[in-house]
Amino acid sequence: MSPIRISAISYLNSLPFAWCLEHSAIMDKIDLSYDIPSQCADKLLSGEADIGLIPIVETLRMPEHYIISDLCIGADKAVRTVVLASETPLANISTIYLDSHSRTSVALARVLAQHFWKIEPEWIHFSGDITKYPRSGNSAAVVIGDKAFGMQSPYVYDLAVEWREFTGLPFVFACWVANQPIDKEFINRFNRTLNGLFDNINAIAEHYSDQTPAGVDLLDYWTNNISYPLTADKREGLKLFLQYATHVVH
């Protein structure tokens, strides 16, 4: 039997998943690769991967998809690593530069701009280092991932907090998704493996301590910012977001 090809996210928020997979017997059954979120989705869409930890908005592009895990990359409150960095208060923003690494975060910013912030900025896809976006008086940028830590801008808006204030619900950034039905026995093993993060979170933080940006407490980030269980509230938030996102995804 061919190994199941899994594409996982290469950010700090998903390192607990990586550790659990790499320290389990399931490694004999899988071909594991690490990518930025948008590449995880592209691999799943092209058939280069069977399972991916993908930005949830990508499911709108998939003719067939299955959420196969009760774990996700989510946030009940501030997530810290998905932000709108701005030179001006929200009401004055005229241009927003977009990070290409995750289409979910871009879609979330568009939803919030239209329905919550009530602004109509110009949206510009930025191919370079998003932390170096053109800083004019009324510009802003969607910044995601590890580079969002310590983002230096006059105004930094956490998009998970903004979504919570808008809807009263938590937000789901990424889920484990398959592009075809997967053997149930494998899915059960896969989920048991991933759930090992809760019992091993301290050891995982120690394991990756040398990969941590200065000033970042991994354990605090994983326990107080990232929320891994895909709860009923998160599923409700996910469903609502996809309803909004259908109208802003291009």
Per-region residue spans from a language model:
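Pocket-lining segment of extracytoplasmic ligand-binding domains
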Residues: 125-207
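Ligand-binding cleft/hinge of the Venus flytrap
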Residues: 16-28, 106-125, 206
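Short, glycine-/small- and polar/acidic-enriched structural segments
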Residues: 12-92, 100-101
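An extracytoplasmic/periplasmic, membrane-proximal ligand-sensing/linker region
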Residues: 147-148, 204-250
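Short beta-strand->loop
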Residues: 4-10, 94-104, 109
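Short helix-initiation/N-cap motifs at beta->coil->alpha
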Residues: 31-42, 120-137
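Immediate post-signal peptide segment of exported/extracytoplasmic ligand-binding proteins
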Residues: 1-5, 89-94, 247-248
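A bilobed periplasmic-binding-protein/Venus flytrap-type ligand-binding module shared by bacterial periplasmic
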Residues: 20, 82-90, 95, 171-185
